[in-house]
Each structure stands twice: as C-alpha cells, then as structure tokens.
C-alpha cells in the first residue's frame, strides 16, 4: 500500500484547522465529609459566599463557610446520596427563586417549587433571595393604613403600609389567628399577601391553606412552606425567599403584606447550621450574627417612593409608591420577652403586639395586652375616624386595669370608680372578636362611636357583643348610606353622627337588651 505524504499532510492540516478549542471552565472540588446536611469540600478556590453549588444527582447546596483549605456548605434537601469523593461544581450563581404574579394562589417550598399538586408555575422571572434593603433616600414615610379588621389592633396598635409590627406571645395564644385575619381582611384591597410557614407541622400548614381557601383569601396569597420535616437549610432560607417574592410587588408600585410564622424557628434552624459548621456559639448557643440574620430580613420591609419605583421599573410605573409590610411572629417561652431572639426582634421592628396566655384562657380573644403593645409609626397611618374615636380606648383599658387591681382591696367604691370599672369591663368585652369575622372601617367606627357616647352604659356586659352585632345589622339595613359615607371619606360627618344618634334611640326602643 502506497502512502501519499501530501494527502496525509492535507488531512492533518484540515484536522488542525477545524480543531475546537472551546472549553468550559468550571471550578470543581471534592467532598471530604458529609454530616447532618453539612458538606466539607476541598478544591473550590473560587467559591463565593452564598453561592449555589451543584452536587451529583441534581442536588444543590449553599456555600456558607469559606475557609483556607475547604468550603463548608449546607445541602438544600436530601443529602443521603452524597458521599466522600464526589465531585462538586460551582455554578457561579447566587441562590435565586421564581417571582411574579403566577405564584399568587399557590403553595411553594423554600426554593419556589410548587408543592400543591396544581402543576408547574409558568414564570420566567427569578430574583436573588438576599437583597440589600432600600436606602434612606429611596424610602417614604408610612402614612397609609394596613387594616387588619381587628378592633383591638386597628384602634390601639394600628399598622401602616411599609411597617414591621411584631406579633409576640407564648404558644397557643392566637398569634397565627391574628396574622390570618390580617390576610383575610386584605381581600378586595389589591394587597398581595405572602404567608411564610417555618418549621411547622405539614398538617398545620395544610389547615391554614384550607382556611384561607374557605374565606377566599388564597386568590391574593402566596404560601411559602418549609415544614418541620425539611432540612434546616430550607427553614433558614424560607423567609428570604418569601421576602423576595413580596419585593417583586413592592418594586412595581404595589402593596404587599408578608407574615413570617415564626422567626423563632428560623433562628433555631440557623443555630443548628452554625453549630454544625463549627462557628463559635454565643448567648443561648446562637451564633454571633443572629441579630443580623433578622435585621437584614426585616429591613427589606419598607415603603419606597415614586422615584425609586420609576427607577426599578425603568419608567414603566410612574407616580406610585410601593410597600412591603411585615408581620413577624415570635414564640416566647413562659412569657419571657427578655430572651435573646425576642429582644433582638423587638428592637428591630416598629412596634409589637403582645398576646398573653392568661387573657387567652380568660376568653379575651384576640388576647392583646393593650398596656405593653405599641405601634411606633402606625398612628400616622391610622384612618382619621378610627384615630378620633379610638383615642380613649387604650386609656379606658389602662384605667380599668389599675382600678380593677385596686378594687380587690377596697370593699366600698364610690359611684365614679364603679362607673369607670363598668365602662372598662364593657370596653374589654367589645374588644373581643371571633376569628375570620373582620370588620371594615365604618363598622369599627360604629362600635367605637357607641362606646364613646355612652350608648353601652345601660347594656349588661354579658350582652354587649350581641348588642353590638344587632346594632350593626340594624344600621346596615336601615342606614347603609352612613356606612358607605364613612368608608369612602374615612371620617364621620356631623350629619352621620345625628343619623346614628337617632338610629341608636330607635334601636334601643325596639331591642330587648336589659338583663
């Protein structure tokens, strides 16, 4: 066989000319150890803090400890199949979750994957879970109300759009019930709600979703669930994922409300991760940055001004402010609000609603302690009519508590003291409200107006709630224009007051309310 040198030369030349030298450069590392969802990796020299790492079997992790000779990462999900010697690659991306209107009405996990069996979520938009909070110049002061529909909250500790109001109390004091009422009350207001369930039983979360569906609230709600059975890493990132989903609406000039239920369990999950990563423990074995864990999350709840919205939407939305209101929940142990995490979150938020076991067991629900519950900015956002009529409620309750304690030692009370005690009892009774029976501004104003003008002075305490309910029904049927006027203007005119006075007289003459 004759070899042709020229032919061979041409073949080699063609091969060299067509040689593809494109190479994908990816930093790879090797798994050194796997323990309790924490993976130590050698060789990832270019890893970023918070970067997504890819493990075999399409599993992802989060780089958290960048040390001299190894990287400590947490696995986001199952880790049983990861073994020593496996190859890990850097993705070059920070953890992102899907965002957009397509998520509304769905139940997703901490990574934004649907878990409600209703098929895939068709959104192309994603956003990083960690974002820098809006700066001072980008913010606008809180001056619009975020109505919860609960008399005790809207009259005494009002919440404004863009505020952070902590709900704090022992277990089984109705913390979730207050938050769910606030979500249900946003129906028809255009406010998108995000409910983040952290470390709860799957059955409890299913129950919450069912209740929201029953009251038509899932139409404007996203539920982010990281159940107690899921990895600690997912419980740790769930609030950040939910916050990113809420920021999508805030940055487009809309209003959103986010509930974190609850941040105590997130702190416990973060403590677990930190201790397994061998980070030095501090007070109550929490790591040193547990304050920053919550502050960087809650600072993202804000009201942003028109210029910021215009800038973030590239000029598409003009003249609109956006807001993200946060209702974080903290569970205390035996009423100890001076523990590490409760004191941290109290100092970060713009006020707190204290729920007490004794009040709850006494049948006062919502079990709000009006004496130590405050709203530091909500007063500026309160509806005019509620601010005017509700001003005396807190004072009446404070005086009642003081006199009630004093009256235990005194046998004979003068007439003025006795009247004040009776008034306080009626106010306490009227602040009670059943779950999912929220009131609008006008209905709430009606009750407060009746308290202020002494309409309940001759009504027995036991019949006060029934009297309130019947009077509301009476005004709804006989004078609906009064309620419409108050809802429309946010104030009560002299004409409306005269109509209500006549209505009260007429109602009292026809309704048998005496003992």
Curated annotation (Swiss-Prot):
Site entry (Required for activity), positions: 373
One MF term in the entry's GO annotations: ATP binding
One of the GO biological process terms: proton motive force-driven ATP synthesis
Catalyzed reactions: ATP + H2O + 4 H(+)(in) = ADP + phosphate + 5 H(+)(out)
Coiled coil start-end: none
Entry binding sites for ATP: 169-176
Protein's membrane topology: Peripheral membrane protein
Subcellular location(s) per record: Cell inner membrane
EC number of the protein: 7.1.2.2
Family annotation (InterPro entries): ATP_synth_asu-like_sf, ATP_synth_asu_C, ATP_synth_asu_C_sf, ATP_synth_F1_a_nt-bd_dom, ATP_synth_F1_asu, ATPase_a/bsu_AS, ATPase_F1/V1/A1_a/bsu_N, ATPase_F1/V1/A1_a/bsu_N_sf
Top enzyme class: translocase
One GO location term (cellular component): plasma membrane
Record keywords: ATP synthesis, ATP-binding, Cell inner membrane, Cell membrane, CF(1), Hydrogen ion transport, Ion transport, Membrane, Nucleotide-binding, Translocase, Transport
Broad class of the protein's primary localization: membrane
Assembly: F-type ATPases have 2 components, CF(1) - the catalytic core - and CF(0) - the membrane proton channel. CF(1) has five subunits: alpha(3), beta(3), gamma(1), delta(1), epsilon(1). CF(0) has three main subunits: a(1), b(2) and c(9-12). The alpha and beta chains form an alternating ring which encloses part of the gamma chain. CF(1) is attached to CF(0) by a central stalk formed by the gamma and epsilon chains, while a peripheral stalk is formed by the delta and b chains.
Family classification: Belongs to the ATPase alpha/beta chains family.
Described function: Produces ATP from ADP in the presence of a proton gradient across the membrane. The alpha chain is a regulatory subunit.
Protein name: ATP synthase subunit alpha
């Amino acid at each position: 066989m004759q070899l042709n040198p020229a032919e061979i030369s041409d073949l080699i030349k063609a091969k060299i000319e067509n040689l593809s030298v494109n190479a994908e450069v990816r930093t790879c590392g090797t798994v050194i150890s796997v323990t309790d969802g924490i993976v130590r990796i050698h060789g990832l020299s270019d890893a970023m803090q918070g970067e997504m790492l890819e493990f075999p079997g399409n599993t992802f992790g989060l780089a958290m400890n960048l040390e001299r000779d190894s990287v400590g990462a947490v696995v986001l999900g199952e880790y049983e199949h990861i073994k020593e010697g496996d190859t890990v690659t850097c993705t070059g991306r920070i953890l992102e979750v899907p965002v957009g209107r397509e998520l509304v009405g769905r139940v997703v996990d901490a990574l934004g994957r649907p878990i409600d069996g209703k098929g895939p979520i068709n959104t192309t938009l994603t956003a990083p879970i960690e974002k820098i909070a809006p700066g001072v110049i980008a913010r606008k002061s809180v001056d619009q109300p975020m109505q919860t529909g609960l008399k005790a909250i809207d009259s005494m500790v009002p919440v404004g759009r863009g505020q952070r109001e902590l709900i704090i109390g022992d277990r089984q004091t109705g913390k979730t019930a207050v938050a769910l009422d606030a979500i249900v009350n946003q129906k028809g207001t255009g406010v998108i709600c995000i409910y983040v369930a952290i470390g709860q039983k799957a059955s409890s979360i299913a129950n919450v979703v069912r209740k929201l569906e029953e009251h038509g609230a899932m139409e404007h709600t996203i539920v982010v669930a990281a159940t107690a059975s899921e990895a600690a890493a997912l419980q740790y990132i769930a609030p950040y994922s939910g916050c990113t989903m809420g920021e999508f609406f805030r940055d487009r000039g809309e209003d959103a409300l986010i509930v974190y239920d609850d941040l105590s369990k997130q702190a416990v999950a973060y403590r677990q991760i930190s201790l397994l990563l061998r980070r030095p423990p501090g007070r109550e074995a929490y790591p040193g940055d547990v304050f920053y864990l919550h502050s960087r999350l809650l600072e993202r709840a804000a009201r942003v001004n028109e210029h910021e919205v215009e800038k973030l939407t590239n000029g598409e939305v003009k003249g609109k402010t956006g807001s993200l209101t946060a209702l974080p929940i903290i569970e205390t142990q035996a009423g100890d609000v001076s523990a590490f995490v409760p004191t941290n979150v109290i100092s970060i938020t713009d006020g707190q609603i204290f729920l007490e076991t004794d009040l709850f067991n006494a049948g006062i629900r919502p079990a709000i302690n009006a004496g130590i519950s405050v709203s530091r900015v909500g007063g500026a956002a309160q509806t005019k009519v509620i601010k005017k009529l509700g001003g005396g409620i807190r004072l009446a309750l404070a005086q009642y508590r003081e006199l009630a304690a004093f009256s235990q030692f005194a046998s004979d009370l003068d007439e003025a003291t006795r009247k004040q005690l009776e008034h306080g009892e009626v106010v306490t009774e009227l602040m009670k409200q059943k779950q999912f029976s929220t009131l609008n501004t006008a209905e709430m104003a009606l009750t407060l107006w009746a308290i202020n003008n002494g309409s309940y002075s001759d009504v027995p305490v036991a019949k006060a709630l029934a009297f309130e309910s019947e009077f509301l029904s009476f005004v709804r049927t006989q004078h609906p224009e009064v309620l419409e006027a108050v809802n429309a203007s946010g104030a009560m005119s002299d004409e409306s007051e005269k109509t209500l006075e006549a209505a009260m007289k007429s109602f009292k003459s026809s309704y048998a309310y005496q003992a």
